[in-house]
From Swiss-Prot:
Keyword match Cytoplasm: yes
PANTHER family (alphabetical): IMIDAZOLEGLYCEROL-PHOSPHATE DEHYDRATASE, IMIDAZOLEGLYCEROL-PHOSPHATE DEHYDRATASE HIS7
Gene Ontology BP terms: L-histidine biosynthetic process
Pathway this chain belongs to: Amino-acid biosynthesis; L-histidine biosynthesis; L-histidine from 5-phospho-alpha-D-ribose 1-diphosphate: step 6/9
Family of the protein in this entry: Belongs to the imidazoleglycerol-phosphate dehydratase family.
Listed EC numbers: 4.2.1.19
Protein name: Imidazoleglycerol-phosphate dehydratase
């Protein structure tokens, strides 16, 4: 892959103003500022373990709640992902990861298929982690999957601590997406589909 796989997205609505810069072939560097501390922590982990360089600046109506900012960040990140990945020539397409964090174990399987779907099987026993509603993690991953045109299966295999469960899920997503976006040395620049297009 000789061309840079980078993208910049600036998405503005009446509820949020989000700028994202993404480099799929980075070193895991990030600058994340969404105004939501725990969400920043998760996005930093996503960049670090995906080896993506990622800058996110999000301003949203946090005085209402965090929903719009979290969902719109997922949408904008998905848009950046689509633009950066290009025509998908030579990528592995599929990725999977099992990631532990103490007692928690999360599995993520990814397919950069052009067919957006999220299967979510994660159970949080608390409504919030810090100030963030735990139901918003599913909203983020759904918004990302739909906008990035990827299939994601996110499954909690074990865990009791909600912080650990969330973090293991983000790290597993990072590793699965890293695998799926990497160059396949045997693919010789081919589209990874029998249809010839994704």
């Amino acid at each position: 892959m000789d061309t840079a796989r980078t993208a910049t997205i600036h998405r503005v609505t009446s509820e949020t103003d989000i700028t994202i810069r993404l480099d799929l072939d980075g070193t895991g560097q990030s600058r994340i500022a969404t105004g939501i501390g725990f969400f920043d922590h998760m996005l930093t982990a996503l960049a670090r373990h995906g080896m993506f360089d990622l800058d996110i600046e999000a301003k949203g109506d946090l005085h209402i709640d965090f929903h719009h900012t979290v969902e719109d960040t997922g949408i904008a990140l998905g848009q950046a992902f689509v633009r950066a990945i290009g025509d998908k020539r030579g990528i592995r397409r599929f990725g999977h990861a099992l990631v532990p964090l103490d007692e928690a174990l999360s599995e993520v399987v990814a397919d950069i298929s052009g067919r957006p779907y999220l299967a979510w099987a994660v159970d949080f026993t608390r409504d919030k982690i810090g100030e963030m509603d735990t139901e918003l993690f599913e909203e983020f991953f759904r918004a990302f999957a739909m906008s990035a045109l990827v299939t994601l299966h996110v499954t909690q295999k074990a865990g009791r601590n909600c912080h650990h469960i969330a973090e293991a899920s983000f790290k597993a997503a990072a590793r699965a997406l890293r695998m799926a976006t990497e160059a396949d040395p045997r693919a010789a620049g081919a589209i990874p589909s029998t249809k010839g297009v994704l």
